[in-house]
Amino acid sequence: MAKGGAKQRTKKKKAAPEKAAIHIHSTFNNTIVTLTDTEGRPIIWSSGGNVGFKGAKKGTPFSAQMASDKVAKEALNLGVKRVDVYVKGPGSGRESAIRALQAAGLNVESIKDVTPIPHNGCRPKKKRF
């Protein structure tokens, strides 16, 4: 028999610093936006699928804008004012995600492209026609 006095644990909201980093990982299929502290520990995240888009619609600039807007609003509620933005990947949601962060009221101090570029590493896939 189950005990009646079991307590449910509620997840505590992490106290965010005034300055944080936002990582935007943009692929052709989706865009993932993550708010981290300055050491890189994640605080909040969102993606195209997380805000309600399915399938090919997750890779659109509009879904990236919605995901960024959600993260920016949560960040402002936690007290984050200044952010550094790190963008990775070739997807279509890069620019619209950055614009959404600025429009939401966050002070974007720097934007860095951290897309990994091979120095002639692995052989790429064959071309698709």
UniProtKB/Swiss-Prot annotation:
The keyword Ribosomal protein applies. It holds the Pfam family Ribosomal_S11. GO terms for biological process: translation. GO terms for molecular function: rRNA binding; structural constituent of ribosome. Keywords: Ribonucleoprotein, Ribosomal protein, RNA-binding, rRNA-binding. Gene3D superfamilies: Ribosomal protein S11. Residues 1-14 have a biased composition (Basic residues). Residues 1-20 are annotated as: Disordered. PROSITE patterns: RIBOSOMAL_S11 (PS00054). Disulfide bonds: none annotated. GO terms for cellular component: ribonucleoprotein complex; ribosome. Located on the platform of the 30S subunit, it bridges several disparate RNA helices of the 16S rRNA. Forms part of the Shine-Dalgarno cleft in the 70S ribosome. Belongs to the universal ribosomal protein uS11 family. Part of the 30S ribosomal subunit. Interacts with proteins S7 and S18. Binds to IF-3. This is Small ribosomal subunit protein uS11.
